[in-house]
Each structure stands twice: as structure tokens, then as C-alpha cells.
Amino acid sequence: NKANQATYERLQLLAKAVLTAGYSVIVDVTFLKKLQRARLRCLAAELSAPLVILDFQVAEAELRRRIQQRATEGIDISEANMTVLDYQLAEQQPLSEEERALALTVWPDTMPAEVTERLSERGYDRNQSRFDS
């Protein structure tokens, strides 16, 4: 839909501004569609910026449990509900082989320090908030 497309276009513009300023950027959005991911990959290539995809792997039952728990506790800060989850599960397109080569898979039991370590293995310097060239 148009609102969804506008969101991705805006995120791409913001990412470009941050990258052009010489910093790393995290674009935190679902990227369900290959086209959405391809546009960001093109931006990274255009700016000679490294790209890492954080591929969060959570079982569907666990996703449903989390949504239900947040709804029960009344602490949900997102628009996530079962309808949104059903849509996302139906619409998601798996990572291509090329995208998987760029991906770090993150499981529910993956500790943040492990993600940081794996990013540093790819050249990310958290003290500089950027990848080493």
C-alpha cells in the first residue's frame, strides 16, 4: 500500500543522510519483500557502505505468545497484533542466497554481546559507530 511504500522511501532517505555523514545506520523495519531489501542494498552499494542483514528467527508460536502476553499486560508499544502477524507471515519473502551471505542470524537466545562480536568480525567498530573501511 501507499503508506507502507512511503515509510520505506522515508527510511531510505534518512539512511542515506546518516551514511553520507559518515556513520553507520540501523534501519529497523520488517523488510518482508525482496524489493524493499533490494532498494536498501542498492543504496549501500551506491554509497560504498557495508550492509549487514540481521535475520531474526523466532518460531511462529513464540511470536503469537509474545503478542498475546503484551496484549494481556497492556504494554505493547507497537501496532503488532495477531492480524498484523498473520499478514507478515503470509507476505514475507525469504532471503535470497545473496542476502543470506550478508545476514547474521539472530535467535531468541542470542545474547547482544554475541551480535556485537559477530558484527565486529565484519569490521564494525562500536566505539566509532561505523564500519572500518
Map each language-model feature to its residues.
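Hydrophobic helix-cap positions at the C-terminus of alpha-helices
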Residues: V18, L43-L47, L95, R122
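Conserved phosphate-donor/acceptor-positioning beta-strand/loop module used by diverse small-molecule
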Residues: E46-I67, V106
